[in-house]
Amino acid sequence: MFQKVEGIVIRTTDYGETNKIVTIFSRELGKVSAMARGAKXPKSRLASVSQLMTHGHFLIQMGSGLGTLQQGEIISTMKEFREDIFLTAYASFIXELTDKQXXDKXHNPYLFEMLYQTLHYMCEGVDPEVLSLIYQTKMLPVLGMRPYFDTCAICHQETDFVAFSVREGGFLCSRHAEQDQYRIPVGEAVHKLLRLFYHFDLHRLGNVSVKDSTKKQMRLVLNTYYDEYCGIYLKSRRFLEQLDKFQI
């Protein structure tokens, strides 16, 4: 059976001397992997369409196991990701998070649209770090994680938020922050932005500017929460941390 899908290449794996296994996150089928025979050869008709982050239409011969990529038509090469190491790093993080958390052939048009929109904004020059924070935040309910962003995790009141508690699963107000000795102190902007990112429509994203200190706090909150409740290891996250450490 042949299946035509619109999708984005989120992972490629070399297979033998000339072949690739490409993992595509598609609008129609969710995540699907296929063998791209001969794709490593420069003159192959599959060479360009099997590049990481390529957005296109793909014709896949489906089987009981791994499918076969028969042909592809490029919508966008998203070449910006091959021209900037920072964009490459953040795009890889987005794609790896999507890959790790999406089951094969699980239809999820919402996640496809979010993936496409995030990568598109990156190509347009929107702050990739902010976009990665938005994506991480919006992935929480997709993964079944619903931290307390609107109220205090203990008293459930909408009040002054001064810390984030991984143990309690959300923000803490000034009255209850002392109940978790491992709480993460946060500024008011961190709470407001995480709550905004969690709820707002990504299509409505306008000009966005966030202080470096605020982004650092948000990253700490999200990474610590993911580590506790999600338990996945992302190579791309490690690379981002190295870029930040050495200020490359």
Curated annotation (Swiss-Prot):
Q: Which GO terms describe its cellular component?
A: bacterial nucleoid
Keyword DNA repair in the entry? The reply is: yes
Record-linked InterPro entries: ARFGAP/RecO, DNA_rep/recomb_RecO_N, NA-bd_OB-fold, RecO, RecO_C
Would the keyword Cytoplasm be found if you checked this record's keyword annotation?
no
Alphabetically sorted, this entry's keywords are:
DNA damage, DNA recombination, DNA repair
Quote the SUPFAM superfamilies the UniProt record gives: ArfGap/RecO-like zinc finger, Nucleic acid-binding proteins
Q: Which residue windows are transmembrane per the record?
A: none
Q: Name one Pfam family in it.
A: RecO_N
> Which domain of life, per UniProt?
Bacteria
Q: Which family does it belong to?
A: Belongs to the RecO family.
Query: Could you tell me what this protein does?
Result: Involved in DNA repair and RecF pathway recombination.
The protein here is known as: DNA repair protein RecO
The organism is Bacillus cereus (strain ATCC 10987 / NRS 248)
Q: Which gene encodes it?
A: recO
